[in-house]
Curated annotation (Swiss-Prot):
Protein name: Epididymal-specific lipocalin-5
Annotated InterPro entries: Calycin, Lipocalin, Lipocalin_CS, Lipocln_cytosolic_FA-bd_dom
Pfam families: Lipocalin
Disulfide bonds: 82-176
Signal peptide: 1-19
């Protein structure tokens, strides 16, 4: 019985985090979601309170279907350089829910909102140092006029318990985006 307690507690934490979910895209159409997306903002509570968040370069993501798996190629800024990462995702337990397995562990990825043509809001839940961690990301198909997408992002992240100080608008620096674009161009 004592050995079950940590797992029950972990399950409760995951359940509480999942219980804060908003309205997930019900009739999710993966074929409309495929393609190139710019990462223009994110929400996270991982930062140290009171410290200014340094500006980060914009990231990007390419979503493809390969052999019945969702193939994600992403680029993002970490520390002082761009990181290019390729992962696959399997369908989760509902529409717009996916499981991503990486060396560092599993992540649940949920498409919270999208109109497929201009923006997508993604909710990512993972276990970090034994604690459930949630990050929400705002992706856009273009770099132009994302006011409505940012408004929707602020509203949804607020509904999920993030404050304005947890939101980060990424710097309009395409260094990492170009890494992804050149990797895509060099594929056979």
């Amino acid at each position: 019985m004592e050995n079950i307690m940590p797992f029950a507690l972990l399950g409760l934490c995951v359940g509480l985090a999942a219980g804060t979910e908003g309205a997930v895209v019900k009739d999710f159409d993966i074929s409309k979601f495929l393609g190139f997306w710019y990462e223009i903002a994110f929400a996270s509570k991982m930062g140290t309170p009171g410290l200014a968040h340094k500006e980060e370069k914009m990231g990007a993501m390419v979503v493809e279907l390969k052999e019945n798996l969702l193939a994600l190629t992403t680029t993002y800024y970490s520390e002082d350089h761009c990181v290019l990462e390729k992962v696959t995702a399997t369908e989760g337990d509902g529409p717009a829910k996916f499981q991503v397995t990486r060396l560092s562990g599993k992540k649940e990825v949920v498409v919270e909102a999208t109109d497929y043509l201009t923006y997508a809001i993604i909710d990512i839940t993972s276990l970090v140092a034994g604690a459930v961690h949630r990050t929400m990301k705002l992706y856009s198909r273009s770099l132009d006029d994302n006011g409505e997408a940012l408004y929707n992002f602020r509203k949804i992240t607020s509904d999920h318990g993030f404050s304005e100080t947890d939101l980060y608008i990424l710097k309009h620096d395409l260094t990492c985006v170009k890494v992804l674009q050149s990797a895509a161009e060099s594929r056979p």
